[in-house]
Amino acid sequence: ADQWEVLGTKLATQFSNSIRNNFGFLNRCEDSDPNARDKTFRQEGRKVFKEVVPLAAAHIEAHLAALEQAPTAVRRYWLHQANHGMNQLVIKKLVGADAGADVAPLILDEFANTASAGSIIAFHKHRDDLAAGDLGVICSFGAGYSIGSVVVRKR
């Protein structure tokens, strides 16, 4: 069995109205239609994309900088698996170039969007080829916005 050292963890949240749901326990206190459009999940997809990409890239970059590591020193990025284009843009902002599945593997074709579990599934399925000493970043990001990352090194 392979072993991994956790070099650091980092969490961040930033409020956004681009993803929201106004339904909750306080709705019983107001005279409004419980089936109204604002009581269901809604998302402004393009706005979310434009807001999350720089947030995720900056989060990962700051996390690596705190550990005195450059984004280009990372052998593999296991990112949130909701949108291929979003992942590619995050990686491009980090390493300055397009990256293939060897650097940022995808599992969307096999599992679709598995929410925050996607980065862990990607890690599970795409880690065996790394050598001792290789660095990796596991990062999930999503609604609200929340971002969590773990920087690991293979032993």
Spans of features found by a protein language model:
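A generic secondary-structure signal
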Residues: 62-66, 125-126
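Short, functionally important structural connectors and interaction interfaces within domains
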Residues: 33, 40, 61, 100-106
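Short, flexible active-site loop motifs that bind/organize anionic cofactors or intermediates
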Residues: 46, 64, 109
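Condensing-enzyme catalytic core mediating Claisen C-C bond formation in acyl metabolism
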Residues: 1-50, 54, 58, 141, ...
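Alpha-helix termini
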Residues: 64-68, 95-98
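Claisen-condensing/thiolase-fold acyl-transfer catalytic domains that form or cleave C-C bonds
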Residues: 53, 57, 75-155
